[in-house]
Amino acid sequence: MAAAEEEDGGPEGPNRERGGAGATFECNICLETAREAVVSVCGHLYCWPCLHQWLETRPERQECPVCKAGISREKVVPLYGRGSQKPQDPRLKTPPRPQGQRPAPESRGGFQPFGDTGGFHFSFGVGAFPFGFFTTVFNAHEPFRRGTGVDLGQGHPASSWQDSLFLFLAIFFFFWLLSI
């Protein structure tokens, strides 16, 4: 019966991952065969690139991903085994930093009643002259855009009827404020 267990990969069989000459160990982060294996003082095994990335992304809370014990570069031990081609300490080299990717800016097409500022903004004026309101209404922050026919995304030129309507409402509101 014991011979049958050994042939089919039972608890003591040659197909067990933890036993035999071809034993491999799994990283507790990526769950793959550990490359440049290191062991934490709490006994958990990791790939050094995986653990390095784990530590770099959480600099204020450096804890073991498995048991949440304290962990750092100094609290891991590199593993060396028979047939290891790299006898150097994997902690001394760090994986290369990933390349940055710049996403394309989002287009905010359509009607934008307060210019291209991304929304309405408030400014305080002195006395009866709220200068922030006038600069928002008359687009003083973009003096050269008016009348140039710049396309805002969906075929609406910058000097459309919507600008005139908004200007009329602003002037009406201003005179209403003066009459109060």
Swiss-Prot record:
CDD domains listed in its UniProt record: RING-HC_RNF5
Catalytic reaction annotation: S-ubiquitinyl-[E2 ubiquitin-conjugating enzyme]-L-cysteine + [acceptor protein]-L-lysine = [E2 ubiquitin-conjugating enzyme]-L-cysteine + N(6)-ubiquitinyl-[acceptor protein]-L-lysine
Membership in a protein family: Belongs to the RNF5 family.
Presence of keyword Cell inner membrane: no
Gene Ontology BP annotations: endoplasmic reticulum mannose trimming; ERAD pathway; negative regulation of autophagy; protein catabolic process; protein destabilization; protein K48-linked ubiquitination; protein K63-linked ubiquitination; regulation of autophagosome assembly
Name of the protein in question: E3 ubiquitin-protein ligase RNF5
A GO cellular component annotation in the UniProt record: endoplasmic reticulum
Tissue-wise expression: Widely expressed.
Membrane topology: Multi-pass membrane protein
Location of N-acetylalanine modifications: 2
Residue ranges of the region described as Disordered: 79-110
Pathway involvement of the protein, from the record: Protein modification; protein ubiquitination
Pfam families per record: zf-C3HC4_3
Gene this protein is translated from: RNF5
Record PTM Phosphoserine, positions in chain: 84, 107
Main location (coarse class): membrane
Superkingdom: Eukaryota
E.C. designation(s): 2.3.2.27
Source taxonomy: Eukaryota, Metazoa, Chordata, Craniata, Vertebrata
Positions of transmembrane segments: 118-138, 160-180
InterPro entries linked: RNF5/RNF185-like, Znf_RING, Znf_RING/FYVE/PHD, Znf_RING_CS
EC category name: transferase
